[in-house]
Amino acid sequence: MTETHTTEVRGDSGRAVAERVASRVLDVPDFPKPGVMFKDLMPLFADGDTFREVIDGIVRHYGRDSFDAVVGIEARGFVVAAAIAYAAGVGVVPVRKAGKLPRVAYSASYALEYGEATLEVHQDAFTAGHRVLVVDDVLATGGTAQATLDLVERAGGTVAGFTVLLELGFLGGRERLAPRAVHALLTV
């Protein structure tokens, strides 16, 4: 385990909560391949008090009445999205990897380092004008996020916000998503 450093904190959750979050993000070297430093958020999810503070802070940041549904991006985004949806009293909609949804779905592909991946959302996931908060655990290059934002709009939703727990600022995801606002609790 190596130390995680907070280089920037954004949002209304506050520095104290962000520092607690940072202390619960573990660096796992050489995962999933040599040379990659994986940021493991599972200890954060396992700490009920800190996780509750994070979820409540995100709901406060946007306001309970500013979104009608929460989209979670497969897979760890499901954990965060479901908790936010529950706290706000709205529904949760999964954006899944290709072939995982049982009904007719929209799909969007995005580039990976060596290939391409595809995400899907049910075509009937939203009604026209549905305000949707899009949530993921980590923002890296922004490919997954951009594909998801495009899917929400194709399915009739209006993106009310995009939030992540951890932004890997050095990978440029925020710039890729511009001019959309990105709410990141913690940026490294």
From Swiss-Prot:
It is an enzyme of class 2 (transferase). It is found in: Cytoplasm. Its main location: cytoplasm. It catalyses: AMP + diphosphate = 5-phospho-alpha-D-ribose 1-diphosphate + adenine. Gene3D superfamilies: 3.40.50.2020. Pathway: Purine metabolism; AMP biosynthesis via salvage pathway; AMP from adenine: step 1/1. The keyword RNA-binding does not apply. It comes from the Bacteria. GO terms for biological process: adenine salvage; AMP salvage; purine ribonucleoside salvage. Its EC number is 2.4.2.7. PROSITE patterns: PUR_PYR_PR_TRANSFER. One of its GO terms (cellular component) is cytoplasm. GO terms for molecular function: adenine binding; adenine phosphoribosyltransferase activity; AMP binding. Keywords: Cytoplasm, Glycosyltransferase, Purine salvage, Transferase. NCBIfam families: apt, PRK02304.1-3, PRK02304.1-5. HAMAP family: Aden_phosphoribosyltr. Catalyzes a salvage reaction resulting in the formation of AMP, that is energically less costly than de novo synthesis. Belongs to the purine/pyrimidine phosphoribosyltransferase family. Homodimer. This is Adenine phosphoribosyltransferase. The gene is apt.
